[in-house]
Amino acid sequence: FDAMQGYDRTCTISVIRTAALDALAEAVGNAWLSATAVPSASAVQQFVSPNDYTYRYRYFDLLHAVESAATPEAAAAVSAAVDAAVVYRAATPYLWEKDADHPWDYYQVKIDCHCGLTTYIPSSQADFDTYGYSQLEWATDVASKLFNK
């Protein structure tokens, strides 16, 4: 995953134990119930450049999002659930790192947090209808707990 250089050295990879996802969903749902605010999109690790207006605010590190909004106890439970679910994770230091052939940093994303799972963070109840998100079980069973308390 990490054999390329510069702009082409772009990868996150995870191996997930799917049998652990129900416990993870329960832990994240409880964390969202404990949250006093919606995680700030500008404060959570994104995996798309904020300059990319087509895809920004869609791909966030799950654990970093939870840690930014939930109680410490709820975040610790999610961290344990992530550890149980993520068998392997790795990431390059940047996504689309600028280099001699790509001297701009418009799309460059520094990866500071990578728990192995990403999430979409709706900023309001209305965001649940964006791109069919409300049709996903994760949206209705887990993410909706940010707003339906």
Predicted regions and their residues:
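Terminal, contiguous helix-loop blocks that mediate binding/assembly
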Residues: 1-149
